[in-house]
Design a protein with these regions (language model features):
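Generic recognition of stable, solvent-exposed alpha-helical segments in well-folded globular domains
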Residues: 41, 83-86, 110-114, 142-143, ...
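Active-site beta-loop-alpha junctions of metal-dependent nucleic acid enzymes
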Residues: 64, 73-96
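Mobile-element integrase/transposase regions
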Residues: 1-62, 70
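Amphipathic alpha-helical packing elements
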Residues: 43-48, 127-148, 196-254
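RNase H-like two-metal-ion nuclease catalytic core shared by retroviral integrases
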Residues: 104-119, 126-152, 163-167, 193-195, ...
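Charged, gly/pro-enriched flexible loop segments at helix/strand junctions
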Residues: 171-206
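Charge-biased, low-complexity intrinsically disordered regions
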Residues: 36, 55, 170-173, 227
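Mobile genetic element proteins and their domesticated derivatives, centered on retroelements
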Residues: 44, 63, 69, 88, ...
């Protein structure tokens, strides 16, 4: 028993601060977001569990840049710390601009030493929202429903072999959404009596927001213009539909039908 406890508590090369203290070390950030430059994103996981949380299943890591609403998604097997770190690494490499900040909720897939050390090594500022305050992560929470649930629904994804096809889907879907689908950003939320009144900006695509943002270098914008010039929204949408069908066929053929 003593040997087991020692093995569990050994954290070679890391701080001796207890893991329970991480929530005290990682600062809470509630805004304002308006002054944050591109690269500061909100991040969350979406579970693909169907009607049951039992057993193994897929999770989508959803990252939304607050300044431009540029989004990237990555599906992974379960929501372990190492799997989540790997997903963040892929997302970071695929962003058109440097990742500067990651702002999750208080979930254990993000609030752990693997993620904290990864953020420090990559010069990514790690902050967190308050427990039970979804509004602290409103930008990514909105995308959870508008994108992940809209395109993948609530079906249980418990076939690991389907994940590569799901990530192929996300690659094309992200291109389609970032370049061609406009959305509005909430600028102000004012309480009037028992209701809230929200003020939104003009609807723009994330691509348009990147091109007009003064802090993004011209070489980044030039690369995106070249990419945009090679894309056809109709063909991308057809690809998205085809990849959804392919991914769910794999899931249907090898998944657990009783847990869908």
């Amino acid at each position: 028993v003593d040997l087991f406890r020692k093995a569990r508590s050994r954290r070679s090369g890391m701080s001796t601060t207890k893991p329970s203290k991480l929530k005290e070390i990682i600062p809470i950030f509630t805004g304002p977001w308006a002054g944050k430059p591109p690269g500061f994103g909100q991040v969350d996981t979406v579970v693909h569990c169907g009607a049951s949380l039992e057993g193994n299943m897929a999770f989508t890591v959803n990252w939304t840049d607050v300044a431009t609403l540029w989004g990237k998604r990555r599906i992974q097997w379960n929501k372990g710390q190492l799997a989540t770190r790997a997903s963040l690494s892929v997302i970071k490499e695929k962003l058109p601009f440097p990742m500067r900040g990651a702002h999750p909720d208080t979930g254990s897939e993000f609030i752990n030493w693997h993620i904290k050390d990864w953020c420090e090594a990559n010069q990514v500022e790690l902050t967190r929202s308050r427990p039970y305050h979804k509004d602290d992560n409103a930008y990514v929470e909105q995308k959870n429903g508008h994108i992940v649930r809209r395109f993948l629904g609530y079906t249980r994804i418990d076939c690991q072999a389907a994940l590569p096809a799901m990530n192929d889907l996300y690659e094309v879907l992200d291109q389609y959404l970032n370049h061609f689908v406009p959305s509005r950003k909430c600028l102000e939320k004012v309480r009037i009596g028992s209701r809230y009144r929200k003020q939104y900006d003009k609807a723009q695509t994330p691509y348009q927001r990147v091109l007009t943002h003064l802090s993004i270098p011209e070489d980044v914008k030039a690369n995106l213009r070249r990419e945009y010039g090679q894309l056809n929204p109709l063909l991308l949408k057809r690809q998205v539909d085809m990849l959804i069908a392919r991914a769910f066929k794999i899931q249907h053929d090898c998944g657990n039908p009783r847990s869908s």
